[in-house]
């Protein structure tokens, strides 16, 4: 069964593309028709592409991989923040930091700087600074939080990127391409799908459109996370089973030995009484 259906996408306005004069010819395979100068996206292809992307994303989540969600446009940023956070994934909704992927060690240093400032606040070091120094550090911390706060748990390069509006986020896409990181993307009729590994043809300008696509993707990822959790519990149970069996055998052996010792003691006492009676 598909994760989204035609009517659901239609209601969310996923089919609305851009003006014909703004189209990218590479999107032709995903365009159904033109109406009043606007390209209409083939929603049956969108359904198929959502299912394909969702399955891959589910497997990534099941394997414990991290997917970085990227959306800095106003209509999408809050939806992406909420959906990504719901499955414990990092996201970028403010300006894309140049070199975020290609210069990842530098980004990690900036994140560690945030942790250092937090530590200063906790251990009292911050209180010993001058008023001016406190103000500078506080502003620096706020700036870092705004751009990097949502990726503090990203300790290594992500296994994939999910991008809303691949044209706007072309720098992120280019960095991922350079490093061979797979890119999932909502691609509108004005964008180039050629550098996107998993194309989801869809209206990337409407909040409802982003909501329905992200909802399906994150639902699949949540399933993957739940399956991973269940497998971990089963593995732990399987590991504990032999231990429990060994404990049970040891308890039986101990009980048997105790019984044998008791029987021997009783026999010894009985023999002594018999000898005394003689």
UniProtKB/Swiss-Prot annotation:
Species assigned in the record: Parabacteroides distasonis (strain ATCC 8503 / DSM 20701 / CIP 104284 / JCM 5825 / NCTC 11152)
A Pfam family hit: Ribosomal_S2
Region ranges (Disordered): 235-278
Leader sequence segment: none
HAMAP family assigned: Ribosomal_uS2_B
SS bond partners: none
Gene Ontology molecular-function annotations: structural constituent of ribosome
Domain of life: Bacteria
CDD domains xrefs: RPS2 (cd01425)
Source species taxonomy: Bacteria, Pseudomonadati, Bacteroidota, Bacteroidia, Bacteroidales
One cellular component (GO) term of this entry: cytosolic small ribosomal subunit
Designated name of the protein: Small ribosomal subunit protein uS2
PROSITE patterns: RIBOSOMAL_S2_1, RIBOSOMAL_S2_2
Family: Belongs to the universal ribosomal protein uS2 family.
Entry keyword Ribosomal protein: yes
Biological processes, Gene Ontology terms: translation
Regions of compositional bias (Basic and acidic residues) in chain numbering: 252-261
Keywords (A to Z) from UniProt: Ribonucleoprotein, Ribosomal protein
């Amino acid at each position: 069964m598909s994760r989204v259906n035609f009517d659901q996408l239609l209601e969310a306005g996923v089919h609305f593309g851009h003006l014909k004069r703004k189209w990218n010819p590479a999107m032709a395979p995903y365009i159904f028709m033109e109406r009043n100068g606007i390209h209409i996206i083939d929603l049956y292809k969108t359904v198929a592409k959502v299912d394909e992307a969702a399955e891959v994303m589910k497997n990534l989540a099941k394997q414990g991989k991290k997917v970085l969600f990227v959306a800095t446009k106003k209509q999408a940023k809050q939806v992406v923040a909420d959906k990504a956070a719901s499955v414990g994934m990092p996201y970028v909704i403010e300006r894309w930091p140049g070199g975020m992927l290609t210069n990842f060690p530098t980004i990690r240093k900036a994140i560690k700087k945030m942790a250092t400032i937090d530590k200063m606040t906790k251990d009292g070091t911050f209180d010993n600074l001058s008023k001016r120094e406190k103000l500078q550090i506080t502003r620096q911390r706020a700036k870092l939080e705004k751009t990097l706060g949502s990726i503090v748990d990203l300790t290594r390069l992500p296994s994939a990127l999910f991008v809303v509006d691949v044209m706007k986020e072309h720098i992120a896409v280019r960095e991922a391409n350079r490093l061979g990181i797979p890119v999932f993307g909502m691609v509108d009729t004005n964008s180039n799908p050629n550098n996107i590994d998993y194309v989801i043809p869809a209206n990337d300008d409407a909040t409802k459109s982003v909501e329905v696509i992200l909802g399906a993707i994150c639902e699949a990822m949540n399933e993957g996370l739940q399956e991973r959790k269940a497998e971990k519990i089963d593995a732990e149970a399987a590991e504990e089973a032999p231990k429990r069996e060994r404990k049970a055998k040891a308890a039986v052996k101990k009980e048997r030995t105790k019984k044998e010792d008791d029987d021997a003691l009783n026999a010894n006492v009985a023999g002594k009484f018999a000898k005394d009676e003689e």
